[in-house]
């Protein structure tokens, strides 16, 4: 039964990360793969320096293993499944390279912005080439409205923007213990519901595999974090959520379901634009979660608040698509 497979997929993915983490975290410590904290960041973060990073490897292993095991049992391994894994693993590898450079150089710098952008663009281009070759629709639907437009090859521009922008937006959100793991679980959970509602059980299995993986990771990433996912995890999750939005044809709904990621990104854009044009900063620090830190909020209060906002956005997205 598909319903049982969904529950099993989430449970298996959760258990993989929960079982692997106690083994993998000490291994990262022995390798001295600790997070370096940027000097211009909040002073309270300096005590986190040296916390093992690259925990996203465990998330990736759980997602890939669960998807490849459970999906054939209810829907078969489709092109959609392979596309999702292509983006997830591809962006994960890119993040891994970024993290490796950081831990080897012992400073909070990895790939250059240009190198990272080229890598993101290349993976997105491969995704679109396979997507187009496989005959998937290039029609863009307006959520909650009976209106759509066929973008043709221009859809590729939208797709590239979503994958590159999505991975960067999610990456920006990964700044506090448990913040990204929780908001990602909520966003992927919403898309799991919508994919299931469409009968795309393969996509639904992938989504719940992500939910299980990040919730299992959250056990060790909640404040005070014993491990960080690093760019290995954040870039992979960002690319994956964008790919899910594309394959479910709910591209525009990502702005709502991923509302927390959008707000975090906008806070950075507003901060930079304001400083360059007026010499003044709108926020004490960006992304937005750092602003609330400097205002005096506790880390746990910020994280739980952002989770709550993310849940509201997710429910709004489901309401728009299913009931409107």
From Swiss-Prot:
UniProt-recorded name of the protein: Phospho-N-acetylmuramoyl-pentapeptide-transferase
EC id: 2.7.8.13
GO cellular component: plasma membrane
Domain of life: Bacteria
Compartments, as annotated in UniProt: Cell membrane
Segments passing through the bilayer: 5-25, 57-77, 81-101, 117-137, 147-167, 176-196, 203-223, 227-247, 250-270, 302-322
InterPro entries reported for this sequence: Glycosyl_transferase_4 (IPR000715), PNAcMuramoyl-5peptid_Trfase (IPR003524), PNAcMuramoyl-5peptid_Trfase_CS (IPR018480)
Molecular function, one GO term: metal ion binding
Keywords from the named record: Cell cycle, Cell division, Cell membrane, Cell shape, Cell wall biogenesis/degradation, Magnesium, Membrane, Metal-binding, Peptidoglycan synthesis, Transferase, Transmembrane, Transmembrane helix
HAMAP family, A to Z: MraY
Gene Ontology terms describing biological process: cell division; cell wall organization; peptidoglycan biosynthetic process; regulation of cell shape
Functional pathway: Cell wall biogenesis; peptidoglycan biosynthesis
Keyword Secreted belongs to the record: no
Protein family membership: Belongs to the glycosyltransferase 4 family. MraY subfamily.
Enzyme class: transferase
Organism for this UniProt entry: Geobacillus kaustophilus (strain HTA426)
Pfam families to which the protein is assigned, alphabetical: Glycos_transf_4 (PF00953), MraY_sig1 (PF10555)
Gene: mraY
Catalytic function, reaction form: UDP-N-acetyl-alpha-D-muramoyl-L-alanyl-gamma-D-glutamyl-meso-2,6-diaminopimeloyl-D-alanyl-D-alanine + di-trans,octa-cis-undecaprenyl phosphate = di-trans,octa-cis-undecaprenyl diphospho-N-acetyl-alpha-D-muramoyl-L-alanyl-D-glutamyl-meso-2,6-diaminopimeloyl-D-alanyl-D-alanine + UMP
Cofactor(s) the protein requires to work: Mg(2+)
Role summary: Catalyzes the initial step of the lipid cycle reactions in the biosynthesis of the cell wall peptidoglycan: transfers peptidoglycan precursor phospho-MurNAc-pentapeptide from UDP-MurNAc-pentapeptide onto the lipid carrier undecaprenyl phosphate, yielding undecaprenyl-pyrophosphoryl-MurNAc-pentapeptide, known as lipid I.
Main location: membrane
Membrane topology: Multi-pass membrane protein
């Amino acid at each position: 039964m598909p319903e049982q497979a969904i529950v099993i997929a989430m449970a298996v993915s959760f258990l993989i990360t929960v079982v692997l983490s106690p083994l993998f975290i000490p291994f990262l410590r022995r390798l001295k793969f600790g997070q370096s904290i940027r000097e211009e960041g909040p002073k309270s973060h300096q005590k986190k320096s040296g916390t093992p990073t690259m925990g996203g490897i465990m998330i990736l292993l759980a997602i890939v293993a669960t998807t490849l095991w459970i999906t054939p049992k209810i829907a078969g391994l489709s092109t959609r499944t392979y596309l999702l894994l292509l983006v997830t693993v591809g962006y994960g590898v890119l993040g891994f390279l970024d993290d490796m450079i950081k831990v080897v150089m012992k400073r909070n710098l990895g790939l250059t912005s240009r190198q990272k952008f080229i890598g993101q663009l290349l993976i997105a281009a491969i995704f679109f080439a396979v997507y187009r070759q496989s005959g998937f629709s290039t029609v863009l639907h307006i959520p909650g409205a009976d209106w759509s437009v066929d973008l043709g090859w221009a859809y590729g521009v939208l797709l590239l923007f979503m994958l590159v922008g999505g991975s960067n937006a999610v990456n920006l959100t990964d700044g506090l213990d448990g913040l990204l793991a929780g908001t990602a679980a909520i966003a992927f959970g919403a898309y799991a519901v919508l994919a299931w509602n469409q009968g795309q059980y393969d996509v639904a299995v992938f989504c719940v595999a992500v939910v299980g993986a990040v919730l299992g990771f959250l056990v060790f990433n909640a404040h005070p974090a014993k491990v960080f996912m690093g760019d290995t995890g954040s870039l992979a999750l960002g690319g994956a959520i964008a790919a899910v939005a594309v394959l479910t044809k709910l591209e525009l709904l990502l702005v709502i379901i991923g509302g927390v990621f959008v707000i975090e990104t906008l806070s950075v854009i507003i901060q930079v634009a304001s400083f360059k044009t007026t010499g003044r900063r709108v926020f004490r620090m960006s992304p937005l979660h750092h602003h609330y830190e400097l205002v005096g909020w506790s880390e746990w209060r910020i994280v739980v608040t952002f989770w709550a906002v993310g849940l509201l956005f997710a429910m709004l997205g489901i309401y728009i698509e299913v009931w409107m």
